[in-house]
Curated annotation (Swiss-Prot):
GO cellular component: plasma membrane
Transmembrane segments: 4-24, 34-54, 64-84
Organism this protein belongs to: Methanothermobacter thermautotrophicus (strain ATCC 29096 / DSM 1053 / JCM 10044 / NBRC 100330 / Delta H)
Cell location: Cell membrane
Classification of source organism: Archaea, Methanobacteriati, Methanobacteriota, Methanomada group, Methanobacteria
Protein name from the UniProt record: Uncharacterized protein MTH_1250
């Protein structure tokens, strides 16, 4: 019988997959601001998925990639917003 924690992890993984699809849909809008929101949401979703994969399967490099995404994602968003502002 599956442990409740394993069921919760797989449920979170499935919901993050749905959120990732929604974030890609938001990012493909014609508005630049909505694109930034969508990419930021996708960044958070992928980082969370990678941390969850690290926790579930013990794959170490997933954690490192997730930390890099979390640290570099806002930097890219701020840089792109400054370029748009002019």
């Amino acid at each position: 019988m599956m442990d409740i924690l394993i069921i919760a992890e797989y449920t979170l993984l499935a919901s993050l997959a749905v959120f990732s699809i929604a974030a890609v849909r938001i990012a493909t809008r014609r508005n630049i601001r909505m694109g930034l929101v969508g990419i930021s949401g996708l960044n958070i979703a992928i980082a969370t998925i990678l941390i969850l994969i690290n926790r579930m399967y013990g794959i170490g490099f997933c954690r490192d990639i997730a930390y890099a995404l979390v640290l570099l994602g806002p930097v890219g968003t701020i840089a792109f917003a400054r370029v748009l502002r002019g």
